[in-house]
Regions:
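Low-complexity, polar/charged sequence tracts that form flexible coils or short amphipathic helices
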Residues: 21-22, 35, 43-45, 82-83, ...
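Extracellular beta-strand/loop-rich repeat segments of large surface/secreted proteins
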Residues: 101-195
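All-beta strand scaffolds that present successive hydrophobic residues in beta-strands
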Residues: 9, 24-32, 48-55, 72-79, ...
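Internal alpha-helical scaffold/solenoid segments in large eukaryotic proteins
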Residues: 38-39, 49
Length: 195
């Protein structure tokens, strides 16, 4: 399918009083198919979301698969002081060259790769989980929290690219394609999942 700007725009605006606006979670599932768009394929603006992209071929002209950001609508609800659900993305059965950009600092994002090879930047301190059949190559500077059993063999970064990650131990490693992985334990940083 040739889409205009994006494949999915997901956002919320307040229609009145009530806490439901902060607890609602939208579900987005894209199974199979081919999609072309100019902007990020899936855009989440100040909204809690469960996103599954399974076996789809997505070509974004700007090179971004999922982007979260603060809603610029003046009626957008502000979750300040609330522990909101966040944005949970699963990429399954994919080989994709697109980035994941998390710019909504009012909620957290998780990314699970299941039988997926991802080439792209991951920004904003995304909590990243890779199953044994998945691999990530960063093609732009990235910031993540490594979750679960992630082996160095599953990670790569292009020459000149730095991946900053919260993980189990302090280490700096040169990856196979020449990029650098800098890992440090949680210490109250912007990427700390305990925050």
């Amino acid at each position: 399918a040739k889409c205009g700007s994006y494949v999915v725009l997901n956002h919320v605006v307040g229609g009145g009083p009530g806490e439901e606006i902060f607890t609602q979670v939208s579900g987005i599932t894209i199974e199979g198919g081919k999609y072309q768009c100019d902007d990020p394929a899936v855009i989440c603006k100040s909204v809690n979301s469960d996103i599954l992209i399974d076996g789809a071929e997505v070509h974004s002209a700007c090179g971004v698969l999922v982007k979260s950001r603060i809603n610029d609508d003046p009626c957008a609800p502000n979750p300040e002081g609330r522990d909101v659900y966040g944005i949970h993305v699963t990429l399954r059965n994919m080989n994709t060259e697109n980035s994941i950009l998390h710019e909504d600092e009012k909620r957290k994002m998780t990314l699970k790769l299941e039988n997926t090879a991802l080439v792209g930047a991951i920004t904003g301190g995304v909590l990243l989980t890779l199953d044994a059949g998945s691999r990530w190559t960063a093609n732009g500077d990235s910031s993540v929290v490594l979750n679960g059993d992630v082996s160095l063999q599953q990670l790569d970064a292009l020459d000149g690219v730095t991946v900053t990650a919260v993980g189990a131990e302090d280490k700096t490693v040169t990856l196979p394609s020449g990029g650098t992985l800098v890992v440090y334990p949680p210490r109250g940083s912007a990427f700390d999942p305990a925050e």
